[in-house]
């Protein structure tokens, strides 16, 4: 039996996941993080993107995170997300439309603030589409 630890993924609206996992993969402020059992304690910001949860027996779940905080303690990991949406609950057409609008905004932006905001919106839309794609593959 593989080693596991307890994971809680919580958003402002609801608890998205609580249970034993073998590992997770998430994008922290300094880059991609793989958290395995026995990981050193850590507290870091999470960038908008996905969390890949590998549950017991290798089953995977993907959740979109709009950002938040990751806390790693011995035997327990907590993700406090600004917004969290399960892959199967994301709307692909809506994400595609958000991506298109952000791309238009980038091409027509004139100021640094407009460009930065449009880039952030584009990154969120691309992350949502990636979660949708991976969720479909896992099913």
From Swiss-Prot:
Pfam families: ATP-synt_DE, ATP-synt_DE_N. Transmembrane segments: none annotated. InterPro entries: ATP_F1_dsu/esu_C_sf, ATP_synth_F1_dsu/esu, ATP_synth_F1_dsu/esu_N, ATP_synth_F1_esu_C, ATPsynth_dsu/esu_N. Its main location: membrane. GO terms for molecular function: ATP binding; proton-transporting ATP synthase activity, rotational mechanism. Keywords: ATP synthesis, Cell inner membrane, Cell membrane, CF(1), Hydrogen ion transport, Ion transport, Membrane, Transport. SUPFAM superfamilies: Epsilon subunit of F1F0-ATP synthase C-terminal domain, Epsilon subunit of F1F0-ATP synthase N-terminal domain. It is found in: Cell inner membrane. It is a peripheral membrane protein. One of its GO terms (cellular component) is proton-transporting ATP synthase complex. GO terms for biological process: proton motive force-driven ATP synthesis; proton motive force-driven plasma membrane ATP synthesis. CDD domains: F1-ATPase_delta. It comes from the Bacteria. NCBIfam families: ATP_synt_epsi (TIGR01216), PRK00571.1-4 (NF001847). F-type ATPases have 2 components, CF(1) - the catalytic core - and CF(0) - the membrane proton channel. CF(1) has five subunits: alpha(3), beta(3), gamma(1), delta(1), epsilon(1). CF(0) has three main subunits: a, b and c. Produces ATP from ADP in the presence of a proton gradient across the membrane. Belongs to the ATPase epsilon chain family. This is ATP synthase epsilon chain. The gene is atpC.
